[in-house]
Amino acid sequence: PQPGWALIQSSSACVQLVSTGVYNTAMIRVESCAMRADLKGKTLFVTGASRGIGRAIALRAARDGANVVVAAKTDRKHPKLPGTIHETVEEIEAAGGHGLAIRLDIRDDAAVTEAVDQAIQHFGGLDIVINNASAIMLKGTSELPLNRYDLMFDVNVRGSYVMSRACIPHLQKAANPHVLNLSPPLNLNPVWFKDHVAYTIAKYGMSMCVLGMAEEFRQDGIAFNALWPRTVIATAAISILDDAVKPENCRTPEIMADAAHAILRQDARRCTGRFFLDEDVLRATGTRDFDRYAVKPGAPLMRDLFLD
């Protein structure tokens, strides 16, 4: 394994960030919140939903009979990667949900506003926002091209901020509204900064949005939470990590989808401003068989970034 990656076995507990604002294993505690039955009739807006974790979250909600806005920056097939927003919508419809494909670059403020308006016009409201779209480049300060720095900040931090901001007026009208950012707990161990400080700051920016917006909109009853994988997930992102991560040491996106599904069913007024790990959420809800999420059952798993 490369520095910053470790082979791990499973552990338990439901993760919550406590008042110090620093992630540490001593601060983890188990907590259960009341859950609603399912997401039937709810409307979700999912960014980066043409493949990977975004697609998996969309399909899990669709099985409940949810409405899902499938957004991604292109509606054309990628030459090397599977999936388009239109194919995801077809899968949503087949799973029992209702889908709407929207080509959206979240760096474009006007396009974000237009996309949200289109979603409201089509489905009549909005209940849940999944800020999944993200850019990654694990390079040090001297090696990272500045245009890639700009891309990570424009997509990860600013894009999630703008997306949330555009949706808040509609979420204020919803019953049990949630915003879920796919971002890590705020671990200030310097090891997570030294090799890719720009990416770390960009992802932590998403997490800081969770902290700030959870407090800002607490009285409105809008939940802002974060979800992060305990182990690396087999998505297109691992292809840029060369040999640092092998697919057989990963889990599938479905573990994140099931964990997100559990979080989104919780009472928004009671469950906000928290940082969850996928495996821990599912353990807290009774899941014991995690081999079904493994790309290769029985193989050692690679711990994800930002987790000691």
Which positions does each model-derived feature cover?
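A short, exposed helix-loop element centered on a Lys and neighboring polar residues
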Residues: S164-R165, L211
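C-terminal helical subdomain
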Residues: A226-L227, D243-D308
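Catalytic loop of short-chain dehydrogenase/reductase
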Residues: Q172-K173, P177-Q219, R230-V232
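Active-site loop of short-chain dehydrogenase/reductase
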Residues: K42, G97-H98, G125-L126, L171-P185, ...
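Short-chain dehydrogenase/reductase
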Residues: I28-F123, I136-M137
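Substrate-binding pocket helix/loop in short-chain dehydrogenase/reductase
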Residues: G140-T141, P145-D150
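Active-site-adjacent segment of SDR/Rossmann-fold oxidoreductases
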Residues: D64, L211-I222, D267-R269
